[in-house]
Amino acid sequence: MNKTLKYIVLLAIACFVGKASAQELKSEVFSLLNLDYPGLEKVKALHQEGKDEDAAKALLDYYRARTNVKTPDINLNKVTISKEEQQWADDGLKHTFFVHKGYQPSYNYGEDINWQYWPVKDNELRWQLHRHKWFTPMGKAYRISGDEKYAKEWAHQYIDWIKKNPLVKMDKKEYELLSDGKIKGEIENVRFAWRPLEVSNRLQDQTSQFQLFLPSPSFTPDFLTEFLVNYHKHAIPVSYTH
C-alpha cells in the first residue's frame, strides 16, 4: 500500500511539473507581428486561412533562414565559453542556479523549480535570480557541444518561469510598499520577478539566447510563439519608462 501511494504521489508531481513546462501555441503572436514585413508572406497567408500551427512553423522557418542578423553581445561564428560559464550551465541543468557571487556555492531551487525560494532574506538574491544568468552559458554550451540536453532544459525552464511568474496587476502603493509580511504570493513575487532592472536584463540577454538556441529541435514552433509573446510583454513596461 505504501509503495502504491508513493507511486501515485510521484506520478502526480511529474504531471504537475510537465504541465508547468508544457508548450502552447500562442495565436496572439500574429497580432503582435508586422505580417507585411518582407519574408513573412507565407506566415500571413496561413494565419489568414486559420492555419496557425502551420503559420507558426513557417515563422520558425523564417527566423532560421535569416542570414543578416547581428548579435552584438556574442559572435555566433565563434562561440566561446569560460570554465566558470560551463559550470553555471552544468549546474543549471540540475536547477542549481548561479545568482550572485556573494552567495556561493549556489542554491538549488528544486526539481519542480521554486522561483519564489528565498534562502537568505537578501533582496539582491531574489531579484537577481530572475536575471537568469545561467541561460546564456547554457546556450553557449549547446552551440559548442551540440548536446541537446542544454537546449531542452533551457526551453523547459523558460516556459516554467513564464507559468510561475505571471505579471499580475498591482497598484503603485503595493509595488512601493516596504516588505512587512502583508504583501505575499504573486503580488510579492511581481516586485522581484518584474522589477524594471530585471526585465531590462532579460530583454537584452534573450536576444543572444534566441539566436543560440534557434537551431535546436527543442525550439519548436509552439515555443517560438511563447517566446515572442513573453518578449513583447517584457518590452511594453520598459517602453513606458523611457
Residues covered by each model-derived region:
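Bacterial Sec-dependent N-terminal signal peptides
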Residues: 1-23
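General helical secondary-structure elements
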Residues: 2, 15, 60-62, 127, ...
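Extended hydrophobic/Leu-rich segments
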Residues: 8-11, 43, 63, 175-178, ...
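Short, flexible coil/linker elements and helix-boundary hinge sites characteristic
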Residues: 17, 22, 34, 50, ...
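Extreme N-terminal leader/anchor segments
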Residues: 23-94
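Intrinsically disordered, low-complexity regions enriched in Ser/Pro/Gly/Gln/His and often acidic
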Residues: 55-56, 79-81, 90, 108, ...
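Short alpha-helical hairpin
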Residues: 97-116, 128-129
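Aromatic-lined, polymer-binding surfaces characteristic
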Residues: 121-240
